[in-house]
């Protein structure tokens, strides 16, 4: 159960630690300038796979030679997260997410 393990996974390489995206992006920005990076959200990839792939092609300045033909995959189901846990995570990431959104100039709807 997710709630049982929340406190256990607060170290940097943990589930929760990996969610501090601004911290991760800072490391990449030490190696590359922002024009060399593209930020793709999972939500965009899932809702518009071909459009997202086209965006990547444009970013890389390569021909759009491939059309995405998604394979049907079995999706795993997860237990519903408790509202208290969702609120805990929203509050935990709030400051870091604000910093991330400022860094990348876009905002994701992660408060739901």
Regions found by a protein language model. Give the residues of each.
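Acceptor-substrate binding/catalytic loop of class I
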Residues: 12-20
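The conserved 3'-phosphoadenosine-5'-phosphosulfate
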Residues: 5, 26-99, 105-112
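PAPS-dependent sulfation machinery
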Residues: 1-13
């Amino acid at each position: 159960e997710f709630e049982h393990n929340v406190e256990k996974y607060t170290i940097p390489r943990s589930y929760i630690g990996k969610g501090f995206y601004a911290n991760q992006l800072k490391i990449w920005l030490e190696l590359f300038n922002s024009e060399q990076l593209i930020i793709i959200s999972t939500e965009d990839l899932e809702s518009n796979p071909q459009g997202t792939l086209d965006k990547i092609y444009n970013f890389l300045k390569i021909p759009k030679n491939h059309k995405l033909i998604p394979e049907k995959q079995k999706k795993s189901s997860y237990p519903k997260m408790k509202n208290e846990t969702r609120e805990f995570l929203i509050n935990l990431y709030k400051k870091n997410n604000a910093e991330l959104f400022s860094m990348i100039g876009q905002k994701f709807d992660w408060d739901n």
